[in-house]
Amino acid sequence: MLSDAPLSLAPDLDAIADGHLIRYMSTSGTTGTPTEVTGVVFSPKGQPPQQGWPIVSVGHGTTGLDDECAVSRAPDLRGYIWLVRNLTKRGWVVAITDYEGLGVPGPHPYLEPRSEGFNVVDAARAAMSLIPGSSTTWAAIGASQGGQATWAAAELAGDYAPELDFVGAANLSPAADLTEMATHVGDGRYDWSQLSMMPTLLTGLSVTVPELRPENFLHGSFQDNPHDKALLLGCHNGLDPARAAAIGRLRANDFHGITPQDAEIFARALKRISLPLGPASGPMLVYAGGADRLIDARWIHAAVRRACALGDTVQEIVAPGKGHVDPEGERLGVQWIADRFAGIPPPSNC
């Protein structure tokens, strides 16, 4: 822990929890060097139970690539304030990392699983050192980019933070395997939800794969309209009508390479961030929406099969008709964590 400052967001939350804006040390997944990361920690008010408050480290979904897109810089934590309320009411300490490069100077290595995983683990460490009533028991929950982050954290936790008692991760609509997206370069078959993410995806991946040149792939209104480009690469502000309009001007055939090597470089970049990286240190819930148009449930299932082959304990749930980051998945994820904290044996359908 490098620093913390009081954080007050809403009267109803202030009544049940104490908030902290934190800066803490973590590790780069690409270089192995120390990094500074920001985030938030909330602890329940009152006396902790005898065994201490368990900790939940949250991996947030895609918010953007710039410092101002950090969860900790938004008064509603970019929508995560509701989750903080829910979890602290259960008597849990909550930590939300901003991830490396968000909230602090420097590029954000978007979807780099090792960096995100280290950030999630170290947020739990920071919470434990900051909150006197916390226990060493912790779990993780995340969705989309955050689901990838918490899955990676589950794999890293045992060796990276052996002093903590990791009980599992709930990975919701995780960006665990996007390699199929490379097969659509130039063929015009991207779904609208995938189109909306392509500027962020290509630009973010280029941080750790410099040979991937976003300008070789991004054409049409992205290239021709500076205002659209700024909106598409800006913070993801929910249902922002201006950004939605810019997305509406994208066309599937706007995304294609200009050199023979471009598609292969993109494919390698996506393969590099695919999970699993190795066996997990604890059980996992993996939830996917059967109608998810951004991250196909079949892609997630392929990653689960590989994790099962490594000996992981995984409960996979595919919800028919549900889309990306469905509220039902979040409800199931929170209950799954409650069961792990209660010592109930984790289910598996590997």
Give each language-model segment a name.
Residues 1-48:
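Catalytic-loop region of hydrolases
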Residues 9, 175-276:
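Accessory cap/linker subdomain of secreted extracellular hydrolases
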Residues 29-89:
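Short, surface-exposed "cap/lid" segments of acyl-processing enzymes
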Residues 57-59, 99, 319:
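Alpha/beta-hydrolase
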Residues 110-131:
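Alpha/beta-hydrolase active-site loop
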Residues 125-196:
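Primarily recognizes the serine-hydrolase "nucleophile elbow" in alpha/beta-hydrolase
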Residues 258-268, 294, 301-350:
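C-terminal catalytic histidine-bearing segment of alpha/beta-hydrolase fold enzymes
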Residues 280, 285-292:
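Short beta-strand/loop motif that positions the catalytic acidic residue
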